[in-house]
Amino acid sequence: MRKPILSLAILLGMATAGQAQETCIEQLKFPEVGRWAEYKAVYNQKDPYTIRYAVVGGERREGKDLKWLELRMVPEKKDGTIIYQMLVPGSAAEVGDVQEIIMKSGARPAMKMDGMMVKMIRGQMDKQSFLKDVCKDVTLVGRERVIVPAGRFQTRHFRSEKYSSESWLADKVPFAMVKAVGKNYEMALIRSGAGAKSSITEVPQSMGPKR
């Protein structure tokens, strides 16, 4: 489960970095339902994946608007697509308050996590703090034109000396991230668009204890 957790940490960590990084965090707004962005990612310089972030739905609970964020990871060297869906507040500042997580690994049934399972996932993501650096302890290098597989983008370039990471963000891209490089990962935008639907069509089973 390590690599999916790292990818969750990238997504959630981007938006929970803290008030000192407002310039960076302001760009990391979650898009409207249906918008998506797909990346080529490499972990530990050896594990290539195609990763898609998407907003696949929305709910209103207890007077608060929530969004279903989906992370889909497709490994290049082996079978076993992994899908995570996270129900989170629509505000980037509150994204750490995950309400539910649904996971599907390969052909296995989709499983729904809540309660203690969600807390455990949060704890694992906290331990992977080196991937929470997209907006953590960063300085703005400046505006920079970057070329990635998706094309050429005018970005804001951020760098963290503490975490040896760099990120390039653009307002026009869903989830804002165009490129990110850290000690153990690299990500570059392949394509983006609208019309994303849930990659999980079945009713998820509960991972909680059976009663």
Locations of the language-model features?
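Sec-dependent N-terminal signal peptides
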Residues: P4-A15
